[in-house]
């Protein structure tokens, strides 16, 4: 079956292609009475949309969302919420030369083998254009989570070889890179300018954090919260790796270093990333995403055509030299969708559970 829906109680279904007339989403399971407006959704869409700086694709899409159903007089009704974003700046002719060729490291080859045909215009369904609907749906989840005291936000923690230390959340929304260190922005800009001159691309690392999450979210064994987050975050285009907490750094740690010891005042560390045994611990939930460099570059690359003949591919069109630059709001959206789904699932099963043990924060 097609994998176009995520969630159990709070579900998000998307449809649409990069060069189709529109993108759509159906969001189901949102409790009634939640105050929601177009501005709530548009804020995150504007953070993600293309053409916002010289360091991203110059495709000009306003990404103005329309709410078709499920909201009446500014509040959710409890019925399915229909969302629509119209595509307005397609240039399909840019792709006519490669309609019978497979771009290296793209989904062209695998979509062709799976379905027997493919929409070659901008990648069709495999394009990251689809993630606009995830961001719109995620904005609804964020709004609901905020009523429960939960905040989800992210930042870029590495661009290519440049590591970006966390300094302040205030900086994240003040630059095109979502950098938490304002002093790094000139270096990032210079690196991206040189990358464009080299006609190349680069990967990135995004960190996303959820604060205020209560203990208890997650459904062992197969729907562990960390497993669900990894699933959701890995579904984002170009993501090739996900870490929870210390992640792969845990390999080099000893148990005395890695274990998050507890005191009456709180946890002494958070190597687990806020999840123990697949269940949220009450600490901040921390995930890191590795995004590959896009292979949509003008440097020629070797490939084959649909008949298996060797060819050289040069990708035209408008592309992000670093897809990670616009990935922060997408990662936030997917984490918010997972957390809302699990909060509703936890409430359904365990609403009557009362525990006298205090909820610990992190020192």
Swiss-Prot record:
UniProt cofactor note: Reduced FMN (FMNH(2)).
Protein family membership: Belongs to the chorismate synthase family.
EC numbers on record: 4.2.3.5
Annotated organism of origin: Pseudomonas entomophila (strain L48)
Subunit composition and interactions: Homotetramer.
PANTHER family: CHORISMATE SYNTHASE
Amino-acid positions noted as binding FMN in the UniProt annotation, renumbered to this chain: 125-127, 237-238, 277, 292-296, 318
Molecular function terms from GO: chorismate synthase activity; FMN binding
Positions contributing to NADP(+) binding: 48, 54
Cofactor(s) required for function per UniProt: FMNH2
General function of this protein: This reaction introduces a second double bond into the aromatic ring system.
Short name of one Pfam family: Chorismate_synt
Single biological process term from Gene Ontology: amino acid biosynthetic process
Enzyme class: lyase
Catalysed reaction equations from the record: 5-O-(1-carboxyvinyl)-3-phosphoshikimate = chorismate + phosphate
Highest taxon above the source species: Bacteria
Keyword tags: Amino-acid biosynthesis, Aromatic amino acid biosynthesis, FAD, Flavoprotein, FMN, Lyase, NADP
Annotated GO CC locations: cytosol
Pathway terms, separated by semicolons: Metabolic intermediate biosynthesis; chorismate biosynthesis; chorismate from D-erythrose 4-phosphate and phosphoenolpyruvate: step 7/7
Name of the protein: Chorismate synthase
């Amino acid at each position: 079956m097609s994998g176009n829906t995520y969630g159990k109680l709070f579900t998000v279904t998307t449809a649409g292609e990069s060069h189709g007339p529109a993108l759509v989403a159906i969001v189901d399971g949102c409790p009634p009475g939640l105050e929601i407006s177009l501005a709530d959704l548009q804020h995150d869409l504007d953070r993600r949309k293309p053409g916002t700086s010289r360091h991203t694709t110059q495709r000009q899409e306003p990404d103005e969302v329309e709410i078709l159903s499920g909201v009446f007089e500014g509040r959710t009704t409890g019925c399915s919420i229909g969302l629509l974003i119209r595509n307005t700046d397609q240039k399909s002719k840019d792709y006519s030369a490669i309609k019978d060729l497979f771009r290296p490291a793209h989904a062209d080859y695998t979509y062709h083998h799976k379905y027997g045909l493919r929409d070659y215009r901008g990648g069709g369904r495999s394009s990251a254009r689809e993630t606009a609907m995830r961001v719109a749906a995620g904005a609804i989840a964020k709004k609901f989570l905020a009523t429960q005291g939960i905040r989800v936000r992210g930042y870029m923690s590495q661009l290519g070889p440049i590591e970006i230390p966390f300094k302040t959340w205030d900086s994240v929304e003040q630059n095109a890179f979502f950098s938490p260190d304002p002093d790094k922005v000139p270096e990032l800009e210079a690196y991206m300018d040189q990358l464009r001159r080299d006609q190349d691309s680069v990967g990135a690392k995004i960190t996303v954090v959820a604060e205020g999450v209560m203990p208890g979210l997650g459904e062992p064994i197969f729907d562990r919260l960390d497993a669900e987050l990894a699933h959701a975050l890995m579904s984002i285009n170009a993501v090739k790796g996900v870490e929870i907490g210390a992640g792969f750094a845990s390999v080099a740690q000893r148990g005395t270093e890695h274990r998050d010891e507890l005191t009456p005042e709180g946890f002494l560390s958070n190597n687990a990333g806020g999840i123990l045994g697949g269940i949220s611990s009450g600490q901040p939930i921390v995930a890191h995403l590795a995004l590959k460099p896009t292979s949509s570059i003008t440097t020629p690359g070797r490939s084959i055509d649909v008949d298996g003949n060797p060819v050289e591919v040069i990708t035209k069109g408008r592309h992000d030299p670093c897809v990670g630059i616009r990935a922060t709001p997408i990662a936030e959206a997917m984490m918010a969708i997972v957390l809302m789904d699990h909060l509703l699932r936890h409430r359904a099963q365990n609403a009557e559970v009362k525990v006298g043990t205090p909820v610990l924060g992190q020192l």
